């Protein structure tokens, strides 16, 4: 029986390596470390009928080379090799190695080789690409982020939108009715609530960078952050003639200064007004008031998350897009936690602590690390398509759906939709015989359409022979969200039994 290998891609690399250890191993080592991680196979190469084992001369010698060079601080800045992740295999007398290279944390990027930071690589599709200077600088910023608590010389309350400060004071007053916030002097208020700090060098109080972003006048913000750009587009009825129905964008003439506080409030109201767009009304999928409210919770968390975690030193825009069936939030800066940690909750590494503080004190964002968990929980509990996260190439994109999984695919045939609805309804892996038993189905119809769903990467085959089952193909963040959801249900049932 031959061994089947998946095609090369973002997380898989094959190297022939038969006669000598390949120098290109280290480019892939760097790119996997800096991107999503992956597997390097040594002794496997592409043949006429796919990938085949060609073997290596001495696996132990190769392992020693890998371990020695990974530990050499004059060769690479970070050892990302664990002996537990090196697997020696043999097939028909041929040895080959399978080495897992995990993605490293942001503080250790960029991983470079040959003692030169310019030898830093990222993975794009099935190849390793040397980073350009902008990409290297971006990773260095994430490794040692400049604090948005940095104090600004020569900036005063005159650089802030006083109307925004007053509205913020009103929010604080509503949340703290026992305090007389409204009568406080604006500058004293900003000191007390974290927007202003004391410079120990000259004992003067000065604006923090994050406060300028949060409350500032656009012209003042642009002096410090020349690439600052916020953009909201309503594309719920997108056509070639009409690219958006509504837009809010910094840099345009408006009655409001577009800082983070004003953008959040204006755009959240607009997003909430689009929630009912795209919901399907039928006997099995009813729009309930609590579903609408839950989706609004997701939008609030996603919008706050977008503004809190953006890299404002970058040269790309912060974009919010509302479509008929989903919302897309795009920000400069990769996630500083893994997708799994974001979905599970609990872990938080915000880039901008001052902005986090200002959002939280206004009630726009709750405890640290809970936003992603809420977003995934809303989708799970309301049977919506699970959120999708992409974080690479210096950007993070979060897509939130407001319809269920089946309706989110426009290109499915009716038989494929029936099968998918059945799997979703059963909430388990199903047998082919169960699919064949669906009304109007035959063995041929069932197998053909299941294979179509597998080829579209929507459904996955589990097991072999008589134990074969078919279920949804999960992504990693969805699996973590499912685990979190199950654990919470178990905890709630234990509490109920003990009441």
Region spans (language model):
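Short, cationic-aromatic polyanion-contact patches
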Residues: 464-486
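Polybasic/polar functional segments that serve as interface/processing modules
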Residues: 1-40, 44-98, 105-107
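Glycine-rich/acidic phosphate-handling loop/turn and adjacent ATP-lid/helix
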Residues: 327-363, 404-416
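Short amphipathic alpha-helical interaction segments
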Residues: 440-452
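Active-site helix-to-loop segments that bind/position phosphate- or nucleotide-bearing substrates
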Residues: 123-314, 322, 330, 336-348, ...
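Short acidic, hydrophobic short linear motifs in intrinsically disordered regions
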Residues: 426-438, 499
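A short, conserved structural fragment
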Residues: 196, 454-464
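Intrinsically disordered, low-complexity regulatory tails
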Residues: 77-158, 314-317, 366-369, 377, ...
